[in-house]
Amino acid sequence: MPDAARKYQPYPTVGLTDRTWPNKVIDKAPIWCSVDLRDGNQALIDPMGHERKARMFGLLLDMGFKEIEIGFPSASQTDFDFARWCIEEGNVPADVSLQVLVQCRPELITRTFEALKGATNPIVHFYNSTSELQRRVVFEKDVGGIKRIATDAAKMITDMAAKAGGGYRFEYSPESFTGTELEVALEICNAVTEIVRPKPDNKLIINLPSTVEMSTPNIYADRIEWMCRNLDNRENLIISLHPHNDRGTGIATTELGLMAGADRVEGTLFGNGERTGNVDIVTLALNMYTQGVDPGIDCSDINRMKDVYEYSNQLKIPERHPYVGELVYTAFSGSHQDAINKGMKALKKANTSLWEVPYLPIDPADVGRSYEAIIRINSQSGKGGIAYVLQADYGLNLPRNLQIEFSQAIQAITDAEGKEVPAKRIHERFLETYVDQPGARLKFLDHHTYPDTAVKGRRVIEAVILDKGKEVTISGTGTGPIDGFVDALSRHVGVEMSVLDYSEHSMQRGSNASAISYVEMEYPGGKLFGAGINTNIVAASLEAVTSAANRIVGRKAR
């Protein structure tokens, strides 16, 4: 990589030594504005058609968004037509404002008002880029020229709104605010405010976007607090944030911006947007929810939200995405699973509504997820999750090496079928592989042992087995039944085998409880497990040896 100090320069700080935002907390939800249908849509490889837009729009209404940016109607006929559909057929509640975006160009402003005819309290969101870099290399204008673009647009928009009979709301964005000197951003915003003349019953939205995330979140917060202190007519302004996620800190940037005095947030569901995306409104809302703050939008059916997002955007949500990912409520670490299990049990016993479960900052049920999701198994699952399923639902405590081995069998299923494997199917596959073994060559029936008169301390075992359906008696010697039976089977099948590890446990309580034994066997070329279940612990262990031998013989025969 090139020398960083020669190629890049650090972002300037604000010098706000008396900043107050670090001592603030977020104790109420901001005004939310979804920009999924505009900023999110323009970032898609395959932009939404009408059906995909309509489905997303319906979800946003159901979630309770009161401000929805529906498009850029002057930029395309598709967006214009969708705006008309929303107004004429979208069944928009009276308390919902449709927002549209427009550049500060006369012909585009005219077209925008045509698109908004008949809308109730629509928001006209006009913008122009104000950054030092774009002033210099894109527009080749000084600050006065850039300010004039904004003020000319503000005059035209307010005049057209008045001629249309009023009822319009206005939003102005100094685009690339993060690349604009604070004094310049302030000068332009104040000039726009003077023209719009906002009032208590029709405040002007001043949107201060992190169009490109260029600094740590604390510096953005300083900039927001500085603007809130210095903007004219602040009491009649709504300060809005529009963060992107270029540095991966969009959530933190937004939260600190709210602490710094902002009133409103523009973002998208699950963070779709240009480059690395817009800020994720769902994560923001649920972060507030888990701090005891009503987020003001309904995220109780996160599975539907995910489905609509993936259908409308033709994008997949990562498994580890906060709150919604397939694996966020699933623990694979054995210690994590144990802590969750104990926490859930303790919660049931506690006489409180307070949620306190290790590793789960939110109750999955609050967002429409089931508790089974904590132990669900799919193609991304590991040995820990599979072991947890078998332990929690069927009382099987698999040894670690068996967890690793059996997880490969489940992985084969998920890879082949591409869908979730339910707990019942996992248990059936375990029994089929290690216990019942339909079609296997060998089956243990009975045994007896007696002292080996030739070698002190050793015993002879005589066991009755089925070999390809034929009853056979085999014998061997060893220090105990397992050792002797392994010797007998090795001689019988002609493969040298030995026990590497053995464990057993009861599956239920009581004198007639079944026990399960696990045996790891080594043979020339590898090692494999077997398992046996019986009310007699010795019989269970010999069945486990037989199980492992069947798998070894089957492997050798390939």
Swiss-Prot record:
The protein's annotated pathway: Amino-acid biosynthesis; L-leucine biosynthesis; L-leucine from 3-methyl-2-oxobutanoate: step 1/4
Localisation: Cytoplasm
Alphabetized CDD domains for the sequence: DRE_TIM_LeuA
Any one GO CC term of the record: cytoplasm
Domain Pyruvate carboxyltransferase stretches: 30-303
Biological process (GO), any one: L-leucine biosynthetic process
Residues binding Mg(2+): D39, H242, H244, N278
Keywords: Amino-acid biosynthesis, Branched-chain amino acid biosynthesis, Cytoplasm, Leucine biosynthesis, Magnesium, Metal-binding, Transferase
Cofactors demanded by this protein: Mg(2+)
UniProt-listed Enzyme Commission number(s): 2.3.3.13
Catalysed reactions listed for this entry: 3-methyl-2-oxobutanoate + acetyl-CoA + H2O = (2S)-2-isopropylmalate + CoA + H(+)
Similarity comment text for this entry: Belongs to the alpha-IPM synthase/homocitrate synthase family. LeuA type 2 subfamily.
Functional note: Catalyzes the condensation of the acetyl group of acetyl-CoA with 3-methyl-2-oxobutanoate (2-ketoisovalerate) to form 3-carboxy-3-hydroxy-4-methylpentanoate (2-isopropylmalate).
Name of the protein in its database record: 2-isopropylmalate synthase
Species: Mesorhizobium japonicum (strain LMG 29417 / CECT 9101 / MAFF 303099) (Mesorhizobium loti (strain MAFF 303099))
Higher taxonomy: Bacteria, Pseudomonadati, Pseudomonadota, Alphaproteobacteria, Hyphomicrobiales
